[in-house]
């Protein structure tokens, strides 16, 4: 006998069922299928062909209608309605379940305590429930009803009254208590509505509807079903946690990148994982020259939420990386949705901003470090009252030179020495991106890219015609040792990482600089020249109140400038402490060309004046440094040739070298600051005692520089030496 195979899908189960109907495929009807299936309360859909839409699911309810057949088979889908048999096994005709009758009205009982009337998931034992007299058959029917509700929540809500389950506002079984029905139901509805909504949380509804059972086996079944539902609940929790992490940021932005202008996206991504799964994709670093770097809105640490129309919220890290790689390889614009996150405790993926205050400022360490780098001494009390300075730099600017970075005091140019440029570039406020870099799995601390150096020089140093000249300047920095390659390459490349060299070497570099020496051979008599420092015994402020401040020993310097090796030939011993230099022996900016006024001051103060030809020194003659300074300042004539200025035999015979105490009255000094600046510090003698006389014959004096030839960027260095030597800015020590 011919038969027809009917394949039917029951509800949402993955595995279909097969039934053989003893009717030919050309004559099979719905009643034949129902007779073989034995299920009455269901909707039947069959695979059919429509002219407009193609293959569709057609619902057939007429028992005499023929069923559509494909390849001698019928494909059907069954949607169970309320009150049908559970779908855990193939149905049988004998197990058809009738609709449940409503539960009987229980007898009235006394009102329970108020604290038990409004709890969610009532925790009272089964003996407290009103339907304690219910039979096991009624419990089985309740079990079937709960399973049916699990299958189809929408139909369960629509037909809850038809199924015979009396449900409250939030899915709880109503207690039909005649004594306090209205008040108890109202209280339960209000409280449960504000706490749990059955439309949103199916787990709480099932838990509430199963509180009326008293069978141990029923409780065990409920416990097992609840364990089965835990994975979806944890999934919702994980999703909510992920959304919370992303929305906890300041804002979420959408960036559209035009990939036609750039060859690559230019980001590295970092995946975050924990025991609960993957925690999202974050921006690890941004590469120069990419589309993201050109846009500028995305920063390291931002969380990547979506690329184009693909959401990364519930996607694993591996899938997100694969999707992102596929999107980048496709042409067209890329839309990135990122959350601007900030992790207060980064795990090393990201770097803190350079201007972020991390540690409290220690003023003592700051001053000590600044003095070690710049070679300047700490400002001692009384410097603010030194208003007799007549140079172009005021006292306030001197103080600013210690408190502000050099970049705010002067502008850099191509004529600025390399040491000053590097010091400005190395300051934290310079704008150069200096951070830890990774190269071949090696961490390079405080490194910067060669292209960043060229860009910084091109934008901050004046005088470059094009970027190529800035690159040559950077190459000179590498050759001079101010920046170093990680493997000591001597050729500069913009694609390599560099670090700053030993910044203390800037002092060595500055001692060897030249500022267009003027030896006086040109015969120009009207040029302003810079005198060397005065010898000990000079007190440039005769009326300045004395103070008992003792210099602190600065950092020992191992650098000995070659231009000052002759200084050891002069003696700095005890002498007549009463002699003082006059104001005329100082080469100030306001009276350096006024020789007559300088002679009048020399006459009043009793200091040797050479212009008149006689000596008025009351406490011994001055040394040749002071004498040559007076010759240039007071005489007003042409400077002699270098041979005359470099030998002591040209001095008048009645000016033998004498020694003086460097300390001014009331100022005890335990060492000689000038000697300390020029050579490594010797052992400190007792207070008031200077090093003994040296037997080395005097050599050539330091070269005299033009004041106008000193670039403005050396102002801070000049002021530092003024404060160190205890002299105003009229004297400038040439350590170039």
UniProtKB/Swiss-Prot annotation:
Residue ranges constituting the PDZ domain according to the UniProt record: 254-326
Modification(s) after translation: Phosphorylated. Phosphorylation is controlled by frizzled proteins, correlates with the onset of embryo dorsalizing events and is higher in the dorsal half of early cleavage embryos. Phosphorylated on tyrosine residues in response to association with efnb1/ephrin-B1.
Membrane topology annotation: Peripheral membrane protein
Pro residues compositional bias, start-end: 100-114
Biased composition (Polar residues): 205-217
Cellular compartments per GO CC: cell cortex; cell surface; ciliary rootlet; cytoplasm; cytoplasmic vesicle; cytosol; nucleus; plasma membrane
Localization, UniProt: Cytoplasm; Cytoplasmic vesicle; Cell projection, Cilium; Nucleus
Region annotated Interaction with custos, chain positions: 327-427
Domain of life: Eukaryota
Tissue: Expressed equally in both animal-vegetal and dorsal-ventral directions of the early blastula. Becomes enriched on the dorsal side of the embryo after cortical rotation. Expressed along the anterior margin of eye field of neurulae (stage 16 embryos) and in the anterolateral crescent that borders the eye field. Continues to be expressed in the optic cup at stage 26. Expressed in the central nervous system throughout the early tailbud stage including the entire hindbrain.
Domain DEP, chain residue ranges per copy: 428-502
Function: Involved in at least 2 independent signaling cascades, controlling cell fate via canonical Wnt signaling and cell polarity via a planar cell polarity (PCP) cascade. Acts synergistically with dal/dapple-like to activate Wnt signaling, stabilizing ctnnb1/beta-catenin and leading to dorsal axis formation. Also prevents degradation of ctnnb1/beta-catenin by displacing gsk3 from a complex with ARP/Axin-related protein.
Family to which the UniProt record says this protein belongs: Belongs to the DSH family.
Protein name in UniProt: Segment polarity protein dishevelled homolog DVL-2
């Amino acid at each position: 006998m011919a038969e027809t195979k009917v394949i039917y899908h029951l509800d949402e189960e993955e595995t279909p069922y097969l039934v053989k109907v003893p009717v030919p495929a050309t004559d099979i009807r719905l009643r034949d299928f129902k007779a073989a299936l034995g299920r009455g309360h269901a909707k039947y859909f069959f695979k059919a062909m429509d002219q407009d839409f193609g293959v569709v699911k057609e619902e057939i309810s007429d028992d005499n209608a023929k069923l559509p057949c494909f390849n001698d088979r019928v494909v059907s889908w069954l949607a169970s309605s309320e009150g049908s048999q559970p779908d855990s096994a193939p149905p049988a005709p004998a197990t058809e379940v009738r609709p449940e009758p409503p539960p009987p009205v229980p007898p009235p009982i006394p009102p329970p305590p108020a604290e038990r009337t409004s709890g969610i998931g009532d925790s009272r034992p089964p003996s407290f429930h009103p339907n304690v007299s219910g039979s096991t058959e009624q419990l089985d029917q309740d079990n079937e009803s709960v399973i049916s509700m699990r299958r189809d929540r929408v139909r369960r809500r629509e037909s809850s009254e038809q199924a015979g389950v009396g449900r409250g506002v939030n899915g709880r079984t109503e207690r039909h208590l005649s004594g306090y029905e209205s008040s108890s139901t109202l209280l339960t509805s209000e409280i449960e509505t504000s706490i749990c909504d059955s439309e949103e949380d199916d787990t709480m509804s099932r838990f509430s509807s199963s509180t009326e059972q008293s069978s141990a086996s029923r409780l065990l079944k409920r416990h097992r079903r609840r364990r089965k539902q835990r994975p979806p609940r944890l999934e919702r929790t994980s999703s909510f946690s992920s959304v919370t992490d992303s929305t906890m940021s300041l804002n979420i932005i959408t960036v559209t990148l035009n990939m036609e202008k750039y060859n690559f996206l230019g980001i590295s991504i970092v995946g975050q994982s924990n025991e609960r799964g993957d925690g999202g994709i974050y921006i690890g670093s941004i590469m120069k020259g990419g589309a993201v770097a050109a846009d500028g809105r995305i920063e390291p640490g931002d969380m990547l939420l979506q690329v184009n129309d693909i959401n990364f919220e519930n996607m694993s890290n591996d899938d997100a990386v694969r999707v992102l790689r596929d999107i980048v390889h496709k042409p067209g614009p890329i839309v990135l949705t990122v959350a601007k996150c900030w992790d207060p405790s980064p795990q090393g993926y990201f770097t803190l901003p350079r201007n972020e205050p991390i540690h409290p400022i220690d003023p003592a360490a700051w001053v000590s470090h600044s003095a070690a780098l710049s070679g300047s001494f700490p400002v001692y009390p009384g410097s603010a009252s030194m208003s007799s300075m007549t140079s172009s730099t005021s006292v306030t600017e001197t103080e600013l030179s210690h408190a502000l970075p050099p970049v705010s005091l002067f502008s850099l140019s191509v004529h600025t020495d390399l040491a000053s440029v590097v010091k400005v570039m190395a300051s934290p406020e310079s704008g150069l991106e200096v951070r830890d870099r990774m190269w071949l799995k090696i961490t390079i601390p405080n490194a910067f890219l060669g292209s960043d150096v060229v860009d910084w020089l091109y934008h901050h140093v004046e005088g470059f015609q094009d970027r190529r000249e800035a690159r040559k300047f950077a190459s000179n920095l590498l050759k001079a040792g101010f920046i170093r390659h990680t493997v000591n390459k001597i050729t500069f490349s913009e694609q390599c990482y560099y670090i700053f060299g030993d910044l203390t070497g800037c002092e060595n570099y500055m001692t060897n600089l030249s500022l267009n020496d003027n030896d006086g051979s040109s015969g120009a008599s009207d040029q302003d020249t810079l005198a060397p420092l005065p010898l000990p015994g000079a007190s440039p402020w005769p009326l300045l109140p004395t103070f008992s401040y003792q210099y602190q020993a600065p950092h020992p310097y191992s650098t000995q400038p070659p231009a000052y090796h002759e200084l050891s030939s002069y003696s700095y011993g005890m002498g007549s402490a009463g002699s003082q230099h006059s104001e005329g022996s100082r080469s100030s900016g306001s009276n350096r060309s006024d020789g007559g006024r300088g002679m009048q001051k020399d006459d009043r103060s009793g200091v040797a004046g050479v212009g008149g030809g006689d000596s008025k020194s009351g406490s011994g003659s001055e040394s040749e440094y002071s004498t040559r300074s007076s010759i240039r300042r007071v005489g007003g004539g042409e400077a002699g040739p270098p041979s005359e200025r470099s030998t002591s035999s040209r001095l008048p015979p009645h000016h033998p070298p004498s020694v003086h105490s460097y300390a001014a009255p009331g100022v005890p000094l335990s060492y000689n600051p000038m000697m300390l600046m020029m050579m490594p510090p010797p052992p400190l003698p007792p207070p008031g005692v200077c090093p003994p006389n040296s037997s080395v014959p005097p050599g050539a004096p330091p070269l005299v520089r033009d004041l106008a030839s000193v670039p403005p960027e050396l102002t801070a260095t000049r002021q530092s030496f003024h404060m160190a030597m205890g002299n105003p800015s009229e004297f400038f020590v040439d350590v170039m």
